[in-house]
Amino acid sequence: ALVGLLLGVSFVDVTDPINPFVIGVLPTETVSSLWRDIKVYKDHAFIVADNVYNHGVQIFDLTQLRGVTEFTVFEKTYHYDKVGSVHNIAINEETGYAYAVGIGSASQSEYMCGAHIIDINDPSNPTYSGCLGDESTGRYGDGYVHDGQFVIYRGPDSDYYGKEIAFTSNETALGIADVTDKSNLKIISKFDQLNFGYV
């Protein structure tokens, strides 16, 4: 099990669920955070932290855990630094793209947007692929995306069948976009939310 901590991530062996034990930790990239999100793709963990300056995305090769019998403090495999504070990271396993959302102001301005797109087909060598944002949304009119799902559409609409579609929560609206071509992202629609808030 991968468990987010204030100061990093712990790796817990749950082979025997009655007697789980911590085999090691990966320290945080920066400072303590109450919010840490972890997703897994191709035997790699992708770790982000909210409200933490310059945390970025820590990438950890989980195969390093194999055969470990004593508590170990691990080092990251790679640090993706084109974002800073990130609320959540969504991964479309069918396409090999990650979407960093809920990006805080600590992010490098040229990469700041609603959903920051990262090509993770080679997990230990991620590359920036684009920015999705609808500036008619977000409480500051900046296209902020708090959470999202990114899927291959296989529904009844033939115009979008087989395309990679983003469904995003943008504070003031719910957004739908075609993110198939990372160099030509297309807003499809939005549904405005009145009296929005966080609970």
Indicate where each model-derived feature is located.
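Feature marking well-ordered beta-strand scaffolds used for ligand recognition
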Residues: 1-199
